[in-house]
Amino acid sequence: MQHDDVIWDLIGNKSFCSYKVKTKTQQFCRNEYNITGLCNRSSCPLANSQYATIREEKGQCFLYMKVIERAAFPSRMWEKVKLDRNYAKALEQIDENLIYWPRFIRHKCKQRLTKITQYLIRIRKLTLKRQRKLVPLSRKVERREKRREEKALIAAQLENAIEKELLDRLKQGTYGDIYNFPINAFDKAMEKQDEESESEEEEEEEDEEESGTREFIAEDEFEESDLSDFEELNNLKDSSDEEVNDEEESSEESEEESEEEEVKSKAKSKGKAPLKGPSRKKRAYVEIEYEQETEPAQKSKAT
């Protein structure tokens, strides 16, 4: 026969219990069916023939109940009842199953249910959040990966340099035809040239389209800066007109001077006309001076 007081006297006070943990302040119980986790007479699952507790298995709460009628059957000692995921309905299930049980057990079962539901909610929130996962790597693997990265970087730089040099030579026309040249690189270069030419054509078309467009602007949008810009343009036009007039006057003066010089040269070269005919003889250089005599002014008055 099971006697609760005898069992408690044996394991609680005098002899040894494998579930007992002693500390300076109090004693704890490591039994998985303990409702409070403390080692005392009311919460000991071994020294109480009528006992109930709440346990969690894979996110689901269950109510475990033990009665004296099943003490002779250890395999069927605990009755397992699945509780609803809704907290209010789970409390109602506890009240229904523990209707004639001691108030202490009912209260502790509800308290344990609240704690379990709280930490389940906390676990769900943490799983939904993004967390960093630290993956340990051995030093050998890390060194190997670093070496591979360095080699790949050097190879990529070398390939890019070779490709650039070959494209430059191809543009300069050093090679008449393509020999052992990667077709992909050539296609990329041609695509870049096509894109550049297309972009230039689009810019020219946009400039042509914008040149003939007309816009109407309100007076509010016509700011003082725009007026100042127009004044500067007018000043520039006036200055350019003055410069053009000055240039025209200077060109006219230079033309007049050149005409006068031509007239003088013609007057000097009248006596030096060459002889016509097949036979021409060289003559000595002769200077001719012309003198003009003017009558005195007195004689002209007498006549």
Swiss-Prot record:
Residues 189-303 are annotated as: Disordered. One of its GO terms (biological process) is maturation of LSU-rRNA. InterPro entries: Mak16, Ribosomal_eL28/Mak16. Keywords: Developmental protein, Nucleus. It is found in: Nucleus, Nucleolus. Disruption phenotype: Embryos show various defects including CNS necrosis, a thin yolk sac extension and small head and eyes. PANTHER family: MAINTENANCE OF KILLER 16 MAK16 PROTEIN-RELATED (PTHR23405), PROTEIN MAK16 HOMOLOG (PTHR23405:SF4). Belongs to the MAK16 family. Plays an essential role in early embryonic development. This is Protein MAK16 homolog. It comes from Danio rerio (Zebrafish).
